[in-house]
Amino acid sequence: MENPTVFGKIIRRELPADIVYEDEEFIAFKDIRPRSRVHILVCPKEYIPTLADYPDTPEGALKLGKLMLTATRIAKQMGLEGYFIRIHVGEKGGQEVFHVHVHLRSDA
C-alpha cells in the first residue's frame, strides 16, 4: 500500500522537509511545529500506521529496536546531552500523522 500520509510525501520528496538524517530504512526531519529547542521526527520508510501495527514477532521487535537506536544515533550526532523520546499511538493517544514515528526532543 502506498503511504498516503504527509510523511509518505516527504519520503517520496513530494513535500519539502528539513531532513537531518536518512538511510535505507529511516528518515528524520525537523518538526514544523517544534515544542522543544530540538524536535526531530524519526520514522521508518516502511509504511506502518501506528506502533500497535508492528507485528508481535522477532522481526517486529527488531524493527522497533532499530527505530529506537536510530533516534539515539541522531541524538548523539546532534550532541544532545539530554533528550526524551516519545511515541503517540492512535488518535486517542495523540497521534496526528498515521505513520509510526518517534519524537526526539530536547531543551538541553
Residue ranges, per PLM feature:
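HIT superfamily nucleotide-processing domains
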Residues: 1-108
